[in-house]
Swiss-Prot record:
The gene is rsmH. The keyword Methyltransferase applies. GO terms for cellular component: cytoplasm. The keyword Acetylation does not apply. GO terms for biological process: rRNA base methylation. S-adenosyl-L-methionine binds at residues 34-36, 54, 81, 102, 109. The lineage of its organism: Bacteria, Bacillati, Chloroflexota, Dehalococcoidia, Dehalococcoidales. It is an enzyme of class 2 (transferase). This is Ribosomal RNA small subunit methyltransferase H. It comes from the Bacteria. Belongs to the methyltransferase superfamily. RsmH family. Its main location: cytoplasm. NCBIfam families: 16S rRNA (cytosine(1402)-N(4))-methyltransferase RsmH. Its EC number is 2.1.1.199.
Amino acid sequence: MTEYPHIPVMLEESIQGLGVIPGGRYVDCTLGAGGHSEAILEHSYPGGQLLSIDADPKAIALAAERLKCFGSSVLLVNDNFANLKDICQRYEYMPVHGILFDLGLSSMQLDREESGFSFQTEAPLDMRFSPGQELSAADIVNTYDLAGLSDLIWKYGEEPFSRRIARAILEKRPFKTTTELASVIEKAVGGRHGRIHPATRTFQALRIAVNEELSHLESALAQAQSLLGHGGRLVVISYHSLEDRIVKQYFQKEAKGCICPDDIPQCVCNHKPSLRLINRRVITPSDEEISRNPRSRSAKMRVAERIIQPGEGRFFHSRAKGLVNHVSETGSVRYGQAKHKGVVQRGGS
């Protein structure tokens, strides 16, 4: 029997946040080992459909085995969620009832030594989510100048010793392995100070830079919103403050009505809210989950619901019936089923 080492974080909260219904159509933007995808398929039965995306071909292969019992209900795509809208258009998979992002590293990726995400074991300085990417962590630490490296470690790692670490890296490079780099970082900051390893923030910064995680997230949130039907849910689980800040600010901006400056007495922007915040406060794992899965302790979940204004001519759905509807420019409603062409594992462009 195949074992799936990654324990999905806030699984029950994710299903509730998405509002999964039988016959619904969903997107899992971060497939990983397939735990969230499996639960979405189970709760959307009968008639549910799921498109799951991952940049890591090994994740696709593992999840394909796990989800094969769902047959044509699931489509696995080896691509980056930065291309979310193009993927959905390619497979005529729109509009959708819900979209999930479970950001950051899966336990499977973290434990895979050859990927170089962890400093606990010796491995090549890689950190690429997809082997097709050109830039690696080794490229950054071995070629960036002092200012560029220091700024990167501060911006993406929020590391207070960024300049000291960058200077030590320049003095000791070139680097080939994770343990070499971690050792230099630890010495640069004077050893351990508390529970967190001194290299943690720098490794986070390198991983974010290599995979362009923050810019991809910003782009994908807007794409996801455009794919949701009226009442559709957008659920995002983040693991550090940089990710959560992007999600929080995006949700708040899109949930606002008027966005005119305060010194303008009358609204002239005509901006309408396109999202409704389901939870005003961030959702965090229970103490029980954290004790069961310590890697969930930093997780934060935010949930928003799509609002489509009358006259937009955009798809929406009835959550109660799970029907795909269409609001015309005149406000009339047409009921129908959207197409779903793909049912097999595919490679992305």
